[in-house]
């Protein structure tokens, strides 16, 4: 299953702010409500074992996937899980509301390209608490949509609280 064009609101990811063909995230939620992902496990994208980080701006069939992508989701809690070695952004909620990310570790090598830690895009009511970020790009990058989605919906991310988070490698929050 793939997005058919740049106007598909219910897609498996966005690239440069447009809903384009992408590899699905390791964990993908579309229209999910009242869900919890909790545990002490690790979601390892193993991007370092392939060529995901080489020529990272070149599309290979589809754009590089995320580790977690939430599209139009509501009342979601992610707690205690570790995310590492994503091919691209790690945690990417998109047009979602009432999100809590608690006591999570997000890591990637310091030289890994575009491995942002947390990229909320056009989301509302977000809490990040007790997070540890050490990535090859932005630890946190707050987005309002870009190109087609930004021009169409004009929806900035709003009401976001960040507390007790450690940001190491990467560009901070």
Which residues are covered by each model-predicted region?
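Extracellular/periplasmic carbohydrate-active domains that bind, remodel
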Residues: 1-173
């Amino acid at each position: 299953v793939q997005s058919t064009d740049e106007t598909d609101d219910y897609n498996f990811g966005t690239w440069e702010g447009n809903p384009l063909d992408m590899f699905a995230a390791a964990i993908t939620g579309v229209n999910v409500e009242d869900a919890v992902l909790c545990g002490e496990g690790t979601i390892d994208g193993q991007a370092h074992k392939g060529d995901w980080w080489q020529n990272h701006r070149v599309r290979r069939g589809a754009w590089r996937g995320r580790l977690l992508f939430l599209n139009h989701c509501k009342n979601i809690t992610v707690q205690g899980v570790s995310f590492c070695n994503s091919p691209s952004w790690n945690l990417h909620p998109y047009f979602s509301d009432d999100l809590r990310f608690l006591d999570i570790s997000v890591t990637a090598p310091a030289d890994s390209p575009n491995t942002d830690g947390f990229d909320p895009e056009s989301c509302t009511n977000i809490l990040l608490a007790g997070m540890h970020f050490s990535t090859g790009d932005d630890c946190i990058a707050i987005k309002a949509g870009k190109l087609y989605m930004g021009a169409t919906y004009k929806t900035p991310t709003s009401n976001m609280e960040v507390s007790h988070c450690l940001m190491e490698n990467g560009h901070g929050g």
